[in-house]
Every structure is written in structure tokens, then in C-alpha cells.
């Protein structure tokens, strides 16, 4: 059993049901939430047959906290006293049980895939157009509107594609992922239903409060106002594009919890050198300044390096050489190569494809054996000419892989998602053979535990950790993104960079190129990211020679045995 920290013990012993936990990356938030729940149950604050509701955003987070809870609770207590659900799962449960309250059929189709994305593909919308349509639907459906009001709001936008997709949804008698929280909120506006769930759940725990949309906060408050523990970190709020409103959400939570706040400041994940880079960005992110819980345990105090290159080829080669050196000394280590966007990372991707090193691209799904077998066979039978000429590529791929003949729900869902992924890549111009070559077999644990190089973006890396992180593309227009023009956008861009840095345990390298090729092959001069100024003059920031010397002097006998 892990010995709780002082802050974790305080959380366990806090009797009040309303609490705000500010827990930056690597400070033990998940363990603290498990201890919080165990303390509430042991003190009898969740009398049988009432339960604790624990909400998360993703299945991965749900499974992670479930595993932690099982360490602290007897099996019977966990089974009978705890409900762990992601927000869409909770919303689906509420809809199935009470759809009649808002005049809907509880047997409507519940989403198990990105149906709106599939509709955009079927209509052959461009990627930008599909993005705009999905944004229109999301924005409208994050308001407490019934179906008639949604139709009126969409009509007011004049977006014909969004209107047509909504009409198709209603005709198909289905809900989308955007609909689930909307209908759940409408149902919970009925006091009798809200009282039922408030009575069932003696208290609520919310993971990653900074990612809440106003809609999700309203939904939770119908069930647990005044008896909810919110855990998270404003410096990790990077989902504004999905409707999250971290500043507003934090203010409302503070009004609810009052002075009941516990703040973590000790990191157990990252070396002092990495934490210094995170702290440098605190004025931009609004985050808590962090210190290492055990600075002496990190060989050499960790590594933080900055480097610039004439172009992306030299940058990519430097990343490859660094990974080669690390894996030679510590073959069990994991190296995250992260960029703000996948497009900016493509130069590093190409270098690793030819490197002979073990690498994993997080943009691509890791398919189970059966799904991978079907997709490989399907793509092997499609010529580039056919793929380029097919007017409805998504429908063609579904037919070609025999999706309609697959009856197992799990296999069908996995195959449907794989078909959508392949369709997107083919529409981007990749050949069927190139898409086929990107198929990898395994499961989610492959990405979470496999040694080697991991290629990902800042958003997909949130919640993960690597022994080393190399950030490429630290240029204006990339980080911060050139589209970051609205109020608050720059703060969120700084938080994206901070999240990327804080994935690292032993060391982080932040790289930029002076010239970057566009997708069309045109070369553009690039200025360094404005955020790099925060790191200048720091004793912890090493240049290329300083980084080389640190690697040469490092105690790899200690580093090699201290992996994630």
C-alpha cells in the first residue's frame, strides 16, 4: 500500500462533502480521490443503500480510478457503494430510465461511434467544412434545448449541412454524443428525477473539473450541488475547442465549495529540471508552482534542453539521434515526441519510420487481431484509382470489409471506427498500401506501456507520462497556434505547452526550426515561439552542447532502472 502524503491524508480525513482539490500533473490526484472516497465510506457518510458517484471524461480515466478505488475498498463495498461512470455513460443511463419525462423514446439508438463524423464523410465534406458543421452542432446542443428548439437554432445559423444531418438523426431515431448530455440535462430539470438521483448518490466526485463544459456542470449540480468533490488543475485546461470554460467553471465551483480547498504543490512524477520549465509557464497558465517531492531521487536533477535548427530535416535527425542514444542506454524507456499538431510532427514521423527503432504513432488506432486482419485484407484489394474515384468512400469501405455481416457488437464497433480512420487517410491522399502499412495490432495497453518512441500531439498526450519528452515545433504559428486569436486563446496555448512538458519524468527537450515546409512543399521562415522567452536565462535550460554533456555524464545505471 502506498503511504499517503500529508495532503492526501488531509483529503481522506476531510468530513465536509463539498471540496475543491487543486492537483497539478504528477501530484497524486487519482490516489487522493480514491482516499477521499474511502474516507467517506469508512466514516459512514454514505449509508446503505446510497452510493458515491464518480464521474470521469474518458473510459481510460474511468478504468484508472476504478483500479485505484479497488486498492482501498473491500470488493463488496466497491460493488455496492460506488458507481464509476464517464459523463456520456451517466447521461445514457439517465436517458434510458427517464426519456419519457421529455417525451422521447428510451429505445432511441445510443451512440457507439462518431455518427456525425460518418455523416460528414458520407457527404464528402472537406475537413474544414466537416469541422465547421460539427462545431455548429456542438455549440447548439450544449444549450438546454429540446429537439424543436435545436432545429430552430440550427435554422438560424443557416448551415444547411448541419440542418440536414440533424434531420437525418431524427429520421434514424438516434442520439449523438452531443445529444446525450443535452437530453440528460433536460431530464434532470424535472425536480422529481433530480431528487431521485440526489437521494441515490450521497455525494459526487468529479475528475478533471477544468474540462467541464457549463452544460456538464449544470448536469452534475442537479445531482450533487453542495456535496461534490471537484479535482483537477486549471493549468491543464486545454479543451476550450470542445466547449470547456475553465475560468467560468472554476469561479462557480469556488462559489459552491467556499473555503474548502486543498492545494497540492509536490510532484512525484517529474524531475526538478522538468518542473522548472512547468513553473516558468505558470504566469501564462495560472497554474500552481511545483516542487519535487524527492529531488535527490532524480539522477543529475533531470534534463531540460532548448535547441534551434535551420530546418525540419535537421530537427528530425536530432530527435532520432537522441532517441537512439536513450534507447541504447535504457531500452525499457519511453520517449514521447510531441507536437502541437500532427502536421508539424510529420517530419519526425518520417525519420522514425526509417530508423529501425521501436515507434508507435498515437494518431493511428491499435487494432485487435480480427479487426486488423479484416482491414488489411480490405485495403489490399483496393487500388489507388478506385479509392480516388469512389464518390462515397465510407459506404464503399463498409461494404468492402463486410461490416454489415459482423454481428458481435465489440468487433462491429472496432471495425466501424477503423473504417472511418482509413477513410480519412485515403481522403488525405494516402494510398491503400500506405494506410495498410500503418495498421498495428494490440490493445490500449500497447500505447500505455510499450518501450520505445511514441509520436503524439499535446492533446492526445494529456494524462500520459513518458521517461523523456521531445517537443518539436516551438515556433510562432504552431505553439501558439496561428488560430489563437480570441480572448483566452493564448492562455490555453500556454497550457497546451505546459501539458506537453509535464508528461516528462527525467527530461524534456524543446526544439524549433527556423524554416518549415508547408503541406504543399513551400518553405516558410519561422520565428521562435513567444513562450520560449520564459525559459531564457534559466540555469536549468541547456543548449545543444549542454544537453550532449548531460547525456555523456548521466548515471545511466540509475536512469535505466527508473522508468515509467
What positions do the PLM features span?
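Conserved P-loop NTPase-based nucleic-acid remodeling module centered on helicase motor cores
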Residues: 49-139
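Accessory N-terminal region flanking or inserted into the helicase ATPase core
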Residues: 1-22, 31-32, 51-53, 123-205, ...
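Conserved helicase/translocase motor-coupling segment
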Residues: 315-424, 439-442
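Walker A/P-loop NTP-binding motif
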Residues: 31-46, 224
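Helicase P-loop NTPase motor core
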Residues: 258-260, 267-359
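C-terminal accessory regions
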Residues: 426-450, 475-564
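Conserved RecA-like helicase ATPase core segment
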Residues: 218-300, 532
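A short beta-strand element within the Helicase C-terminal
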Residues: 454-482, 508
Amino acid at each position: 500500500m502506498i503511504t499517503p502524503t500529508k495532503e492526501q491524508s488531509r483529503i481522506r480525513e476531510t468530513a465536509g462533502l463539498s471540496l475543491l482539490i487543486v492537483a497539478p500533473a504528477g501530484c497524486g490526484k487519482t490516489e487522493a480521490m480514491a482516499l477521499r472516497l474511502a474516507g467517506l465510506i469508512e466514516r459512514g457518510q454514505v449509508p446503505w443503500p446510497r452510493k458515491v458517484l464518480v464521474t470521469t471524461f474518458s473510459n481510460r480515466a474511468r478504468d484508472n480510478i476504478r483500479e485505484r478505488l479497488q486498492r482501498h475498498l473491500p470488493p463488496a463495498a466497491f460493488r455496492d457503494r460506488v458507481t464509476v461512470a464517464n459523463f456520456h455513460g451517466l447521461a445514457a443511463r439517465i436517458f434510458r430510465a427517464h426519456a419519457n419525462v421529455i417525451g422521447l423514446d428510451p429505445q432511441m439508438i445510443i451512440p457507439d461511434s462518431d455518427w456525425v463524423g460518418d455523416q460528414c464523410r458520407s457527404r464528402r465534406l472537406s475537413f474544414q467544412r466537416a469541422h465547421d458543421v460539427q462545431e455548429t452542432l456542438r455549440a447548439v446542443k450544449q444549450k438546454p434545448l429540446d429537439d424543436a428548439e435545436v432545429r430552430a437554432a440550427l435554422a438560424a445559423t443557416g448551415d444547411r449541412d448541419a440542418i440536414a444531418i440533424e434531420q437525418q438523426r431524427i429520421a434514424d431515431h438516434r442520439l449523438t454524443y452531443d445529444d446525450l448530455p443535452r437530453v440528460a440535462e433536460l431530464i434532470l430539470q424535472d425536480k422529481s428525477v433530480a431528487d431521485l438521483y440526489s437521494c441515490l448518490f450521497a455525494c459526487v466526485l468529479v475528475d478533471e473539473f477544468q474540462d467541464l463544459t457549463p452544460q456538464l456542470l449544470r448536469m452534475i449540480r442537479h445531482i450533487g450541488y453542495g456535496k461534490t468533490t471537484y479535482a483537477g488543475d486549471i493549468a491543464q485546461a486545454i479543451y476550450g475547442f470542445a466547449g470547456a470554460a475553465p475560468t467560468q467553471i472554476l469561479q462557480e465551483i469556488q462559489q459552491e465549495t467556499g473555503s474548502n480547498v486543498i492545494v497540492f504543490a509536490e510532484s512525484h512524477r517529474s524531475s526538478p529540471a522538468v518542473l522548472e520549465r512547468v513553473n516558468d509557464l505558470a504566469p501564462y497558465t495560472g497554474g500552481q508552482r511545483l516542487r519535487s517531492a524527492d529531488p535527490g531521487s532524480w539522477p543529475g536533477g533531470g534534463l531540460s534542453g532548448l535547441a534551434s535548427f535551420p530546418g525540419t530535416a535537421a530537427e528530425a535527425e536530432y530527435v532520432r539521434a537522441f532517441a537512439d542514444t536513450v534507447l541504447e542506454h535504457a531500452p525499457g524507456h519511453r520517449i514521447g515526441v510531441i507536437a502541437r499538431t500532427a502536421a508539424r510532427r510529420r517530419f519526425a514521423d518520417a525519420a522514425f519510420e526509417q530508423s529501425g527503432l521501436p515507434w508507435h504513432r498515437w494518431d493511428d488506432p491499435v487494432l485487435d487481431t480480427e479487426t486488423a486482419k479484416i482491414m488489411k485484407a480490405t485495403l489490399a484489394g483496393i487500388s489507388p484509382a478506385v479509392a480516388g474515384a469512389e464518390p462515397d468512400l465510407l459506404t464503399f469501405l463498409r461494404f468492402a470489409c463486410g461490416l454489415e455481416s459482423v454481428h458481435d457488437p465489440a468487433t462491429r464497433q472496432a471495425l466501424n471506427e477503423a473504417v472511418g480512420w482509413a477513410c480519412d487517410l485515403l481522403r488525405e491522399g494516402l494510398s491503400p498500401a500506405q494506410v495498410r502499412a500503418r495498421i498495428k495490432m494490440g490493445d490500449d495497453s500497447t500505447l500505455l506501456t510499450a518501450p520505445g518512441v511514441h509520436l503524439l500531439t499535446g492533446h492526445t498526450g494529456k494524462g500520459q507520462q513518458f521517461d523523456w519528452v521531445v517537443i518539436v515545433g516551438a515556433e510562432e504559428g504552431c505553439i501558439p497556434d496561428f488560430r489563437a486569436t480570441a480572448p483566452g486563446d493564448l492562455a490555453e496555448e500556454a497550457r497546451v505547452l505546459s501539458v506537453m512538458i509535464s508528461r516528462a519524468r527525467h527530461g524534456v527537450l524543446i526544439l524549433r526550426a527556423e524554416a518549415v515546409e508547408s503541406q504543399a512543399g513551400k518553405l516558410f521562415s519561422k520565428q521562435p515561439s513567444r513562450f520560449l522567452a520564459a525559459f531564457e536565462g534559466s540555469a536549468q535550460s541547456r543548449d545543444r552542447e549542454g544537453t550532449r554533456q548531460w547525456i555523456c555524464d548521466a548515471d545511466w545505471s540509475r536512469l535505466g532502472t527508473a522508468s515509467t
